[in-house]
Amino acid sequence: LGRGRFVFTDDYSVFDWGKMPDEIPGKGASLCAMGAYNFERFEDAGIPTHYAGVVDSNGDVVPLEDTDVPPEEMAIELATVPDLPHDGRDYDYDAYYAAARDNVLVPLEIVFRNSVPVGSSLRGRATPAECCLDYDDWPDEPVSLPEPVVEFSTKLEEGDRYLDREEAARIAGPAALDDLESVALRVNELVTDRAAEGGLTHQDGKIECILADGEVTVADVAGTFDENRFEYDGQQVSKEVVRQYYKKTQPDWVDAVADAKTRAKAEDVADWKSLCEREPNPLPDSVVRATSDLYRAGANTYTGIEFFDAPSLAEAVDAVRDL
């Protein structure tokens, strides 16, 4: 299929909304740098990826360490993503794979969790005992897991939903679920170890995969502040900062999103946003600036490369604590 490029923008999304009404400067380049750094580490560890390099100021595809500017484009090996036919919320995965070519996106997100914060959706799907924890009930505090938990959710449906292993295996098609889980656990280990080197705690994240010539290959982007949740000195260093800010300052919109998703499921409507009665408002400039500094300082710390003129991560974290 050849090569393509990911262009990383400063747009962001929370609560599955899609493009929000403003941008976070430097976010795109921060995520591109982190994603490239991780892909190169994965390749060094023997994990296949679709990564081919970043694009420098001359338009050349180079390794991350050879770029002369914070990268905003990543070269990748292309994969097939067929249309997923559906009737309401009934999706035809057999037709999806029938239309696929050799390199096909596995239409799952493989989620890994190292800890379970208060409010995590996992608490509603599993008991502490099922997560190898010695509690009768979930405590009212974050919990570190003795071993990572892997879950599977849909990727291409209008609304994400978590799956049991039987349904996940069906949706995975020709990709073996055990292989997807094994790759996810190895990715989690590498990201967790690198985060710890920079003083960050890696809480959870996800990967997406393609099946390339019969081999599970990591695709999309992995180990960034949008795909994963990290903590530094007790403070979130991820898109979670913005998500929580919207919960605190625009609860009516957050509730409207949840209501629309519930109604869409009950009415068998695929496009839940068409049922949402509110729109999000832009962030204040001060929140945009603080979040921008957090992304850029975090990328500098995680990669060990001073790509961005940003405060230290400790300073950036202090600035977002009270948002």
Residue ranges and their predicted role:
Residues 1-149, 272-323:
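Active-site loop/lid in soluble adenylation, ligation, and acyl-transfer enzymes
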Residues 3, 105, 199-202, 213-216:
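Coil-to-beta-strand transition motifs
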Residues 149, 153-159, 189-199, 224-226:
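Phosphate-binding core of ATP-grasp and ATP-grasp-like enzymes
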Residues 203, 207-250:
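Catalytic activation segment of kinase domains across protein kinase-like and atypical kinase folds
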